[in-house]
Amino acid sequence: MQLNINDEIYNIDQIDSNRKLLWVLRDELGLIGTRYGCGAGFCGACTVHINGQPTRSCIIPVSAIAPDARIRTVEGLAENGNLHPVQQAFIELQVPQCGCCMSGQMMSATALLEKDPNPSREDIRSAMKSNYCRCGCYQRIALAVERAAKLMP
């Protein structure tokens, strides 16, 4: 089996096909930006994009991923050495405290902005509501998404 992750093809024939994508990314491929939070798909820390859709990688086995699927992790947001506008906004507004949820927050925010480049505050709240932040940085997260929308090309 092969996976297209961040526009690179990875051969995972030697990996148990029932293994969750999160652990393949982290343990087998060394892509450790995607975080483990709850292991049950509730918190959003493990969010990646599969064909542009935010997906909880802790609950999806690699066998459930279509052969032609494109997976993007937080490592795949930056292009040509330049931070993605969402990453830049999260840094500018000093969003992270503990950082546990940040990769998932950024992946959900990116998916929102790719679908709706000018979301309202309510749109942001709705899109981000299933991403939990232990530190309660929800106001700064919303501000960062608004800032990122202005930075998007």
Name each model-derived stretch.
Residues 1-153:
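Signature of N-terminal electron-transfer/Fe-S-associated modules in redox systems
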